[in-house]
C-alpha cells in the first residue's frame, strides 16, 4: 500500500492504532527486570475503579432505550413501508444502525463495566491503566453515537433518492463526503475505544503474572483476553470494510460479499468478542447468584469449545466471502453460480456452524447446571438468557442447510430479515438479558442500591417482548419471502402485510422498550 493512496481518515486511524500498540509495548517491554510481588494487593486497590462502574451501566441502559425506541418507530406502518421501498439505504436505517446502538452501546459498555470489576480480582492486581479504561468508555460511546447518527441520516437521505429511481451506488456517490466522513470517523473512534479496552485487559493480565499469590479464579482471565482480542479483530475489520473502495467491492460482490460483512464481522465481534467476555464475567460472578462455579477443568473445556467453534466459523465465512466474492467481481459470475463453483461451500459452513453450536451448548449446559439450584435474584435473568441463546443458536445451523439457505436467498430482503432476527434473539434476548441481570446484581453488591423491587418489570417485558418480536418476525418475514419469491418487490410484500405486522411488532417492541427503560431507571 502506498501512502499516497491513503485518505486522511485512514492515515489518522492507522496512527491512532499505532499509538495504542506502542503504548502497550512500552508497558510490556520495560527496561529492567520487573518487580515480583509476593503479597496480595489490598482489597481497596483492587476495587479502585469500582466507584466508576455505574456510569457504564447507565450509558448502556441509555443506548438500550434509544435502540428500543428505534425498534418501535421502524415498525410503524408508514415507516416500515418506506424503509422496505428504500432498498439498501433502508437496511442501514432499519437494521444496521439499530443493531449497532443496542449491541455495542448496550452490550459492550455493560460488559466493560463488569470486566473492570472482575479482571483485577481474577489476576490479583489493579487495572493497569485508569486512563485506558476512561478512554475505552468515552471513545466507544462517542464513536457509536456519531456512527449511529451518520447511518440514520445518510440512510434516510439515500433512501429518498432510491425511492425516486436512483441506484444505491449513484445515491452513495451523490452523498460523497457527507456519507464517507461521518461514517468513517464514527467507526474509527469506536475502534480506538475498543483498542483501549483490549490494551487495558491485556496489560492488566500480563502484569498480573508478577503477583505471586493464590488466584482461585485466575484461569478465567483468558475468557476476557480472548473476548478483547475478538473485539479488536472485529473493529479493525469494520474500519477496513467501511473504506469506500472496500465497501464498493463488498456491494458488487452481492450475496457472496455478505459472508464477510455482516456475517464474519458480526460473528467475530459477537461470538469471539462479546460472548467470551460475558462467559468470563458470568463464571466469576456465579457465587453472587448463590451458585457454585464450574471446576477449572470444565471452565477450560467451555473456553476451548467456544473459542474453537467461533474461530472455525469465522475462518470459513471469511474464506467463502473472499473466494466467492472474487468470482463474482472479477469472474462475472452471479453469487449463486459462485456458490455452485465452490464444492466446499456447504461443508465449511456446516462444519464451522456445528462446532460453534456445540461450543455454545456446552457453555449453556454448564451455566444452567450451576444456576438452576441457586436462589439469587439474578437467577431468572441468566436462565431466560440461556433459553433465548439455545433457540437462537439452533437457528444458525438450520438456516445454513443448502435447502433452507436457498429459500432464504429466494426471499431476498425478507430472507435477510429472518437471518437478522436470529442474531437479534441471541444478542437481545440472550446475552443482553444476562448482562442486565449481572449489572443489577453488581450494583447491589457494591452498595450503590439494593436489588430493585421492580426488577420483574425489567425481565418480563424485555424477554417477553424479544420472544414475541422474534416469533412474529419469523412468521411475517416468511410470508413476505414467499411473496418476494413470487415476483413481488419487498416493498410490495411489506405493504400487503400492514397493518397486521405493526399490530404485532409495535407492541412487542414497546415491551422491549419498557423492560430496558426499567433497567436504565434502576
How would you name each of these model-derived features?
Residues 1-522:
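Hydrophobic alpha-helical transmembrane segments of multi-pass integral membrane proteins
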Amino acid at each position: 500500500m502506498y501512502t499516497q493512496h491513503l485518505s486522511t481518515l485512514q492515515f489518522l486511524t492507522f496512527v491512532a492504532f499505532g499509538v495504542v500498540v506502542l503504548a502497550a509495548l512500552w508497558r510490556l517491554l520495560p527496561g529492567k527486570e520487573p518487580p515480583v510481588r509476593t503479597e496480595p494487593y489490598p482489597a481497596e486497590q483492587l476495587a479502585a475503579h469500582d466507584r466508576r462502574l455505574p456510569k457504564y451501566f447507565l450509558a448502556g441502559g441509555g443506548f438500550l432505550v434509544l435502540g428500543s425506541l428505534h425498534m418501535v418507530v421502524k415498525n410503524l406502518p408508514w415507516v416500515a413501508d418506506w424503509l422496505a421501498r428504500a432498498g439498501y439505504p433502508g437496511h442501514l436505517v432499519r437494521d444496521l444502525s439499530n443493531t449497532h446502538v443496542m449491541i455495542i452501546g448496550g452490550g459492550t459498555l455493560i460488559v466493560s463495566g463488569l470486566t473492570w470489576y472482575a479482571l483485577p480480582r481474577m489476576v490479583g492486581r489493579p487495572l493497569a491503566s485508569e486512563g485506558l479504561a476512561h478512554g475505552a468508555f468515552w471513545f466507544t460511546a462517542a464513536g457509536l453515537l456519531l456512527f449511529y447518527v451518520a447511518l440514520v441520516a445518510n440512510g434516510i437521505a439515500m433512501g429518498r433518492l432510491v425511492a425516486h429511481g436512483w441506484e444505491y451506488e449513484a445515491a452513495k456517490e451523490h452523498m460523497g463526503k457527507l456519507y464517507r466522513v461521518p461514517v468513517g470517523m464514527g467507526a474509527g473512534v469506536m475502534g480506538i475505544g475498543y483498542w483501549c479496552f483490549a490494551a487495558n485487559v491485556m496489560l492488566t493480565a500480563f502484569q498480573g503474572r508478577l503477583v505471586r499469590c493464590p488466584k482461585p479464579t485466575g484461569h478465567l482471565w483468558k475468557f476476557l483476553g480472548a473476548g478483547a482480542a475478538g473485539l479488536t479483530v472485529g473493529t479493525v475489520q469494520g474500519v477496513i470494510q467501511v473504506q469506500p473502495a472496500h465497501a464498493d467491492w463488498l456491494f458488487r460482490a452481492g450475496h457472496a460479499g455478505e459472508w464477510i460483512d455482516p456475517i464474519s464481522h458480526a460473528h467475530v465481534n459477537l461470538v469471539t468478542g462479546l460472548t467470551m467476555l460475558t462467559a468470563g464475567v458470568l463464571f466469576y460472578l456465579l457465587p453472587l447468584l448463590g451458585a457454585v462455579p464450574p471446576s477449572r477443568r470444565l471452565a477450560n473445556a467451555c473456553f476451548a469449545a467456544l473459542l474453537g467453534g467461533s474461530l472455525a466459523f469465522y475462518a470459513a465465512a471469511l474464506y467463502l466471502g473472499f473466494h466467492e466474492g472474487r468470482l463474482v467481481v472479477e469472474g462475472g459470475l452471479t453469487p449463486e453460480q459462485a456458490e455452485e463453483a465452490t464444492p466446499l461451500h456447504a461443508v465449511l459452513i456446516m462444519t464451522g456452524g456445528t462446532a460453534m453450536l456445540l461450543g455454545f451448548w456446552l457453555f449453556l449446559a454448564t451455566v444452567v447446571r450451576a444456576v438452576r439450584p441457586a436462589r439469587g435474584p439474578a437467577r431468572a435473568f441468566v436462565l431466560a438468557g440461556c433459553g433465548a441463546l439455545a433457540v437462537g443458536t439452533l437457528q444458525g445451523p438450520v438456516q445454513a442447510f443448502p435447502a433452507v439457505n436457498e429459500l432464504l436467498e429466494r426471499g431476498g430482503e425478507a430472507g435477510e430479515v429472518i437471518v437478522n432476527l436470529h442474531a437479534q434473539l441471541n444478542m437481545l434476548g440472550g446475552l443482553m438479558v444476562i448482562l442486565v441481570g449481572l449489572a443489577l446484581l453488581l450494583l447491589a453488591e457494591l452498595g450503590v442500591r439494593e436489588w430493585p423491587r421492580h426488577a420483574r418489570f425489567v425481565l418480563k417485558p424485555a424477554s417477553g417482548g424479544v420472544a414475541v418480536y422474534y416469533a412474529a418476525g419469523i412468521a411475517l418475514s416468511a410470508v413476505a419471502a414467499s411473496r418476494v419469491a413470487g415476483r413481488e418487490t419487498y416493498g410490495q410484500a411489506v405493504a400487503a402485510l400492514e397493518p397486521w405486522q405493526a399490530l404485532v411488532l409495535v407492541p412487542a417492541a414497546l415491551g422491549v422498550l419498557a423492560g430496558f427503560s426499567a433497567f436504565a431507571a434502576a
